[in-house]
Amino acid sequence: MLNLRIMAPNRIVWNSDIQEIILSTNSGQIGILPNHASVLTALDIGIVKIRLNDQWSTMALMGGFAMIDNNNLTILVNDAEKASEIDYQEAQETFQKAKTNLEEAEGNKKKEIEALLVFKRAKARLEAINMASKL
């Protein structure tokens, strides 16, 4: 088992032993099982899948860092939302609005970067819900 702690600035999001986790890093996805080599990696905005008691849970992570050492995985994130706590209708509306804003920001670098960040967050939330419904 892996001891997983996911911490946001204002709360502990997850603190328990798990069987497996799949994270979105800046260079792609990484799967972590017990006895994994020590790793420190940056996390991209995206989804995380956690397996506990042969059941998968899905969460949207808003970027951060992960450190694994000696079967202890600590994840520090800007924010996180469990798929079960995300309202589908609100997430869908936020995604569509973010997509429109990203298209409208084209040509203005500063607005484009800000809009891309909002779009990636909205997309991660929607993907977390969609993936959770398939598990």
Swiss-Prot record:
Keywords: ATP synthesis, CF(1), Chloroplast, Hydrogen ion transport, Ion transport, Membrane, Plastid, Thylakoid, Transport. One of its GO terms (molecular function) is ATP binding. One of its GO terms (cellular component) is chloroplast thylakoid membrane. It is a peripheral membrane protein. It is found in: Plastid, Chloroplast thylakoid membrane. Its main location: plastid. Pfam families: ATP-synt_DE, ATP-synt_DE_N. SUPFAM superfamilies: Epsilon subunit of F1F0-ATP synthase N-terminal domain. HAMAP family: ATP_synth_epsil_bac (MF_00530). Produces ATP from ADP in the presence of a proton gradient across the membrane. F-type ATPases have 2 components, CF(1) - the catalytic core - and CF(0) - the membrane proton channel. CF(1) has five subunits: alpha(3), beta(3), gamma(1), delta(1), epsilon(1). CF(0) has three main subunits: a, b and c. Belongs to the ATPase epsilon chain family. This is ATP synthase epsilon chain, chloroplastic. It comes from Marchantia polymorpha (Common liverwort). The lineage of its organism: Eukaryota, Viridiplantae, Streptophyta, Embryophyta, Marchantiophyta. The gene is atpE.
